[in-house]
């Protein structure tokens, strides 16, 4: 896990700076903002971890020679990018408008990362063209997700739901005069984002199923069972496939193929590759834990039967 541990001190500084900035927001947005930031604070054990958002600039050190100050700024900007887009997601996923009070806060987050980028990239920099492209990619991906089976018909769109994360990788390459690497690094980042979404969707499938949100695991299961897109998938059906028929095994094999594709790009981003490997291992470990639990239950049932028969 060196992809994280090697950057703990830098991350502590970045999140401390983010706290300082948010503390300066007008009341009550300062308190609301600090509470929201704490939810995703990479320093806190109980927080929701979104490692790629704030670690990607540090992983870029594997192929760039940027000054630490520039890397820290890209990480800080991506923290605010993360917070801004998570609020967008909260609002879009909310049926009753319960997150609308976060809209003013989102605009302050937006102001912060835009201010950082303006410090780093002049108006004529190609960065701004990429910046706009990533917004367009995100907008299209989240708008059409419910009507399309991205995971099977346009898998790149799965990654594009997090396209603004790429501000960090593209920004780092432009600052280091390595624009020629943008296509291959973008492909590597997107491959990682796809597998990360697979892992998230395994964790969130019940909630997504209840809310009617698109979910890669459920979509994969639907295809595996040859169900039509309008067929109902019940929680019981998913549980049976996961815990009885080892569907997570098949899901894990897809993640393994993704890792092979990532390695095939032949980009020397060792930390991000190791991070991706940990994602794959998490899925495979989950599959093995299900099998072991089932085996223990079966043995327990036999022991119970024998004890009753003796």
What are these regions (language model features)?
Residues 32-41, 65-67, 92-94, 146-152, ...:
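Short, charged, low-complexity loops and linkers
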Residues 19-32, 45-52, 107, 111-210, ...:
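All-alpha helical catalytic cores of prenyl diphosphate-utilizing isoprenoid enzymes
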Residues 1-81, 87, 123-135, 144, ...:
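Conserved N-terminal diphosphate/IPP-binding helix and adjacent helical/loop segment
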Residues 2, 6-9, 13, 104, ...:
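Alpha-helix boundary/N-cap detector
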Residues 118-136, 224-273:
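Primarily interfacial, aromatic-capped hydrophobic alpha-helices that serve as membrane anchors
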Residues 86-101, 105-112, 174-176, 190-250:
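Acidic, Mg2+-coordinating active-site segments of isoprenoid diphosphate-utilizing enzymes
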Residues 39-45, 73, 97-102, 151-157, ...:
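A ubiquitous short alpha-helical element
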Residues 68-71, 94-100, 179-182:
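Short, surface-exposed loop/turn segments at secondary-structure junctions
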């Amino acid at each position: 896990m060196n992809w994280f541990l090697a950057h703990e001190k830098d991350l502590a500084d970045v999140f401390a700076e983010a706290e300082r900035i948010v503390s300066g927001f007008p009341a009550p947005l300062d308190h609301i903002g600090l509470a929201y930031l704490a939810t995703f604070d990479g320093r806190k054990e109980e927080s929701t971890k979104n490692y790629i958002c704030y670690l990607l600039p540090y992983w870029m050190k594997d192929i760039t020679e940027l000054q630490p100050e520039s890397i820290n700024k890209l990480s800080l900007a991506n923290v605010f990018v993360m917070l801004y887009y998570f609020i967008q997601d909260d609002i879009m996923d909310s049926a009753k408008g319960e997150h609308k009070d976060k809209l003013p806060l989102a605009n302050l987050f937006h102001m912060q990362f835009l201010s950082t980028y303006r410090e780093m990239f002049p108006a004529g920099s190609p960065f701004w063209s990429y910046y706009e492209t990533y917004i367009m990619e995100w907008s299209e991906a989240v708008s059409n997700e419910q009507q399309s089976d991205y995971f099977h018909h346009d898998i790149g769109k799965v990654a594009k739901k997090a396209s603004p994360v790429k501000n960090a990788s593209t920004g780092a390459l432009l600052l280091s005069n390595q624009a020629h690497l943008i296509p291959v690094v973008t492909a590597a980042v997107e491959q990682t984002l796809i597998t990360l979404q697979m892992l998230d969707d395994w964790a969130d499938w019940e909630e997504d199923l209840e809310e009617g949100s698109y979910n890669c695991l459920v979509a994969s299961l639907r295809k595996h069972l040859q169900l039509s897109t309008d067929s109902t998938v019940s929680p019981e059906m998913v549980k049976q496939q996961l815990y009885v028929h080892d569907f997570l095994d098949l899901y894990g094999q897809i993640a393994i193929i993704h890792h092979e594709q990532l390695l095939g790009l032949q980009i020397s981003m060792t930390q991000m590759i190791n991070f991706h490997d940990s994602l794959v291992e998490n899925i495979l470990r989950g599959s093995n834990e299900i099998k072991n639990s089932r085996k223990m239950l079966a043995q327990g049932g036999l022991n119970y039967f024998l004890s009753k028969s003796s």
